[in-house]
Amino acid sequence: MHHRKYFGTDGIRGKVGDMPITPDFFLKLGWAAGKILARQDSRKIIIGKDTRISGYMLESALEAGLAAAGFSALLTGPMPTPAIAYLTRTFRAEAGIVISASHNPFYDNGIKFFDINGSKLSDSLEEAIEAQLEKPLTCVESAQLGKARRIVDAAGRYIEFCKGTFPSEFNLKNFKIVVDCSNGATYHIAPSVLKELGATVISIACEPNGLNINKECGATNIGMLQKSVLAEQADLGIALDGDGDRLIMVDHLGNKVDGDQIVYLIAKEACRQQQLKGGVVGTLMSNMGLELALQRLKIPFIRAKVGDRYVLEKMQKHGYRIGAENSGHIILLDKTTTGDGMIAALQVFKVIIQNQMTLHELCSEIKLLPQVLVNFSFSGNKNVLQSDAIASLVKKVESTLAGRGRILLRTSGTEPVIRVMIEADQEEHFIKTLAEEVAEKIKKSLY
């Protein structure tokens, strides 16, 4: 793969005002994307965004660049990332663009693209866009310029799509649900979906002001949701992230239910209904408890690199329909093309209704193993973990764990840090000591 200057594993991301998250770069990017994606028949591109204040500025720049390349932008206003993937498909648009930095703070922003099928752009297309950025910007003839318009009722269309993934014979009349929208893009979607299906809904963090997205709320910070579920004596709580592609749940006792537990419930039910195609894709960070629980049900499980893009690649390669990251990206290819927090939540409600059990009872079947992560910084070579000494150290730890746990060593993709992760069916203090010993030994072998 070529070295890419701007695109990372999940589009382009950074601090607003610093290159490349600037209005002049976004204008050029809109033009470059338009030039590369142009086909004769369709000149439409859908643009959505989350609730960051900077989204308005960046959207205007992007739409000007697209217009210069002869593309008309269809604007949805604040909408979840998975909604843009869906609308791109239904409008037969050339591409969908989301302006968002997902679970990052408000002063960051970013951009990601979907192709005509609602999937992430291929590496080769991203590289072609980067190459086009090097060329001077030229306008098409005046008569061919694009113009922006709003999609009327984009939210309503997506709400109906979400509801359509829930069995029509079921409703949520007996549920009291707390929903935390992270002051993000699902603020006008998630509460409506749940209310229209009959639930009693208590909404928190559903009042975005451009600056409060992900601030002490949402899927990466569930403290407020846990308190609220207990105070309201709700049946459960759901937390989405700023752009709506992650889901974390909370049971009626205030316990966290993460992506590993959620995907287990959905896969087990699909297996029970004889609708499971293949198995489940997780990541290197998926808890071993998930692997063991799926093993008991004879459901195949494979691990991908961390990142929803890699999970999807593995799913497509093996023909699996269910994949997830423990952080709450749940990909259900029988329902949609990308991770979708709202749709994943509805599938969990379906499992609860079909089994007539609480979320807490359902989760008791999967025992997550205690997991300890020790990080330490290092300087120098990326391949430090490749030595024979470290390989034999890993073997030693694995024999200590005797098949009831695992050790993972990896260097961070974003900072000079080595991560030592150990999880095992053991007391937490035993694992912590073991992880710290391993970290010390690696440090010694480096210097």
From Swiss-Prot:
E.C. numbers: 5.4.2.10
GO function term, MF aspect, one: magnesium ion binding
UniProt keyword list: Isomerase, Magnesium, Metal-binding, Phosphoprotein
Cofactor note: Binds 1 Mg(2+) ion per subunit.
In-chain residues carrying the UniProt-annotated modification Phosphoserine: S102
Record flagged with keyword Phosphoprotein: yes
Residues bound to Mg(2+): S102, D241, D243, D245
Lineage top rank: taxon: Bacteria
Catalyzed reaction equations: alpha-D-glucosamine 1-phosphate = D-glucosamine 6-phosphate
Enzyme class of the recorded protein, top EC level: isomerase
Gene Ontology CC, one term: cytosol
Post-translational modification: Activated by phosphorylation.
Family recorded in the similarity comment: Belongs to the phosphohexose mutase family.
Stated role: Catalyzes the conversion of glucosamine-6-phosphate to glucosamine-1-phosphate.
Protein name: Phosphoglucosamine mutase
Gene: glmM
